[in-house]
C-alpha cells in the first residue's frame, strides 16, 4: 500500500481552481479517498489530459497513485456532494456521492471549468452501508460509453482514467476492484436542488441556483428573472440532449433525477445501452422492470424530471406562489415542443433533408414503423440509407436491412420523390448524412466481450480496440468492418446492470 508519506507527497499534475468547496458546508462532506493495495493504470486519456491543461508526464508517472486515490494531488479539496433524488418515481431525500469523491476543479486551455471526480474511491458519509468501491467491468463500460458519446458529438461526461486497485470487491461474485476518473462541466444534478428543497432550505436553493448561473449560464445574470431564465435554459438543453440520444438509439436506463445534470451533459452510464433492432419499447436495464425508462419514454421522463426541478425553484421564480406555478408550468409545457423541434430536425438530417416540408414527420414515422415491423437494425439502416443517397447501386444493401427485401420499396419511392424537391446534390447529401448516421456505435455485445476479456483474463486488447474504433464513429474504417454488425442471436445482450 502507498505510505501516508507518499500520499501527502506533492504532485503538481493538476492546477486546481476549486469553487464548489467554497459553498456552505451543508452542500458536501469533506472526504479523503481510501487507499488501495496495488493500483495499476489501465488507461490514461492523454488527449483529454492535455486539453485540460494537466501535466501529462506527471500523470504517466504518478497516474496509478493519483487516480486510485492513493496520492492526493496538491491543491485538491476532496469532497462528496450532497443530493437527493427521485429513483424510479420514488423520492429519496438523501442520496449523495456514496462512492465518488470530487478532487477539485481545473480550468482547461479554453478557459472552461471542469470537475475531476474519482468513482469507486471508497466510502463516504453518503455510502448508505455500501463499500464505496467499483468493479472493473462497470469502470470499463463507463470509460467506453463516455468516450463514444463524445465522439458521436453528444454532450456527456468524459473519461480521464481507469485504474485497477489490486483489491477485490464483493457483489454477487468476487470481482477485481477499479476506480474511474470522470470529468464533467459539473456534477450538479436536479437532485442537488431537491436536497435543499426537501429540507425547506430556500437559502440553500438560492445559493445553489446562483452558483449554477455563475458557472453554467452567466449570461442569464442580466435576465429580468434569472431564476426563470435558468429553468428555461435547462429545459432547452435537456430537450436537445434527449433528442440526440434518440438519434443514435441510446437508452440511458436510469433517468432518475439524481442522474440528470443541469449542465445538459449525459451522466452515469451504469445500465445504459444502444439499441440494435429498432423498437421504441426497448429496455436493457435489469432494474427497469416496468419500462419506465424505455427508449421512447425518455423524452417524457425528461419533462417529468424538469417538473421536479421547477418545484424546487418556485420560491425564487416569483414571490407570489400562484404566479410562480404558472410561470414554471409554462416552461414545462413548452418542453414538448422544444423536444419535438430538435428531434425532427435531427431526423430530417438522418434521411438527408435540408429543407423543411409539412410531410416530413409522416415520412420519418413511416420509416420507423417499417423498421420496427421488419426488425431492422437502427444504426445500420440509417448508415445504409446514407450510402444509398450517394449511390443508387447501394439499394440492395439498404433493402437487406429488412426481413423482407421488398418491404422498403414503397418508402424508398416516397423518399426519392421528396428528395427531388430538396436543393442538395446527391454527393453533398450523402456526405452530410454520413456525418449524422454513425457506422459504429458501442454495440452491447462488443462492450460485454471487452469487459469479459478484462475480468476473466486481464486482457485489455478488446477494450483498446473498441476505443480505437469508437473514436471515429462516422468513418467507414474497413479494417474494423465486423464492429459495424449487429449481434448474432447468441451474442445478444438482454440486460445491463448498474455498477459504478
Swiss-Prot record:
Signal peptide location: none
Gene Ontology MF, one: ATP binding
E.C. number(s) listed in UniProt: 2.7.7.-, 2.7.7.108
UniProt-listed SUPFAM superfamilies: Protein kinase-like (PK-like)
Cofactor dependence: Mg(2+); Mn(2+)
Active site: 258
Enzyme class per UniProt: transferase
Keyword rRNA-binding belongs to the record: no
Superkingdom assignment: Bacteria
Pfam families reported for this sequence: SelO
Record family assignment: Belongs to the SELO family.
Its biological purpose: Nucleotidyltransferase involved in the post-translational modification of proteins. It can catalyze the addition of adenosine monophosphate (AMP) or uridine monophosphate (UMP) to a protein, resulting in modifications known as AMPylation and UMPylation.
Stated name of the protein: Protein nucleotidyltransferase YdiU
Species in which this protein is naturally found: Rhizobium etli (strain CIAT 652)
Amino acid at each position: 500500500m502507498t505510505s501516508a508519506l507518499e500520499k501527502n507527497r506533492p504532485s503538481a499534475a493538476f492546477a486546481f481552481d476549486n469553487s464548489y468547496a467554497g459553498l456552505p458546508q451543508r452542500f458536501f462532506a469533506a472526504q479523503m479517498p481510501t487507499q488501495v493495495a496495488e493500483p495499476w493504470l489501465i488507461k490514461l486519456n492523454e488527449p483529454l489530459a492535455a486539453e485540460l491543461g494537466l501535466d501529462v508526464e506527471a500523470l504517466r508517472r504518478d497516474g496509478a497513485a493519483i487516480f486510485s486515490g492513493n496520492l492526493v494531488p496538491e491543491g485538491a479539496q476532496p469532497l462528496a456532494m450532497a443530493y437527493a433524488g427521485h429513483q424510479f418515481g420514488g423520492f429519496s431525500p438523501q442520496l449523495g456521492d456514496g462512492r465518488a469523491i470530487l478532487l477539485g476543479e481545473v480550468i482547461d486551455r479554453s478557459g472552461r471549468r471542469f470537475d475531476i471526480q474519482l468513482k469507486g474511491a471508497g466510502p463516504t458519509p453518503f455510502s448508505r452501508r455500501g463499500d464505496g468501491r467499483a468493479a472493473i467491468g462497470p469502470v470499463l463500460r463507463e470509460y467506453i460509453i463516455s468516450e463514444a458519446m463524445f465522439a458521436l458529438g453528444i454532450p456527456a461526461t468524459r473519461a480521464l482514467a481507469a485504474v485497477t486497485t489490486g483489491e477485490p470487491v464483493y457483489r454477487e461474485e468476487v470481482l477485481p476492484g477499479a476506480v474511474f476518473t470522470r470529468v464533467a462541466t459539473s456534477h450538479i444534478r436536479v437532485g442537488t436542488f431537491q436536497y435543499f428543497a426537501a429540507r425547506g432550505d430556500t437559502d440553500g436553493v438560492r445559493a445553489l441556483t446562483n452558483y449554477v448561473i455563475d458557472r453554467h449560464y452567466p449570461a442569464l445574470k442580466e435576465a429580468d428573472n434569472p431564476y426563470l431564465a435558468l429553468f428555461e435554459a435547462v429545459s432547452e438543453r435537456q430537450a436537445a440532449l434527449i433528442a440526440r440520444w434518440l438519434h443514435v438509439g441510446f437508452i440511458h436506463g436510469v433517468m432518475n433525477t439524481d442522474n440528470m445534470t443541469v449542465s445538459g451533459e449525459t451522466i452515469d452510464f451504469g445500465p445504459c445501452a444502444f439499441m440494435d433492432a429498432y423498437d421504441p419499447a426497448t429496455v436493457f436495464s435489469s432494474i427497469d422492470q416496468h419500462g419506465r425508462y424505455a427508449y421512447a419514454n425518455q423524452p417524457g421522463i425528461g419533462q417529468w424530471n424538469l417538473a421536479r426541478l421547477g418545484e424546487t425553484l418556485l420560491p425564487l421564480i416569483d414571490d407570489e406562489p400562484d404566479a410562480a406555478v404558472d410561470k414554471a408550468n409554462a416552461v414545462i409545457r413548452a418542453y414538448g415542443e422544444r423536444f419535438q423541434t430538435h428531434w425532427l430536425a435531427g431526423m430530417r438530417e438522418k434521411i438527408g433533408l435540408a429543407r423543411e416540408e409539412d410531410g416530413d414527420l409522416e415520412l420519418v414515422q413511416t420509416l420507423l414503423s417499417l423498421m420496427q415491423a421488419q426488425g431492422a437494425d437502427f444504426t445500420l439502416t440509417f448508415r445504409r440509407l446514407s450510402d444509398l443517397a450517394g449511390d443508387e447501386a447501394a439499394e440492395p444493401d439498404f433493402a437487406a436491412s429488412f426481413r423482407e427485401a421488398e418491404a422498403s420499396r414503397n418508402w424508398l419511392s416516397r423518399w426519392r420523390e421528396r428528395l427531388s424537391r430538396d436543393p442538395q446534390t446527391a454527393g453533398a447529401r450523402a456526405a452530410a448524412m454520413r456525418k449524422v448516421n454513425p457506422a459504429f456505435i458501442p454495440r452491447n455485445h462488443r462492450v460485454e466481450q471487452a469487459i469479459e476479456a478484462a475480468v476473466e483474463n486481464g486482457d485489455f486488447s478488446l477494450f483498446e480496440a473498441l476505443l480505437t474504433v469508437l473514436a471515429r464513429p462516422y468513418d467507414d474504417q474497413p479494417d474494423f468492418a465486423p464492429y459495424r454488425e449487429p449481434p448474432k442471436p447468441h451474442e445478444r445482450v438482454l440486460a445491463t446492470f448498474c455498477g459504478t
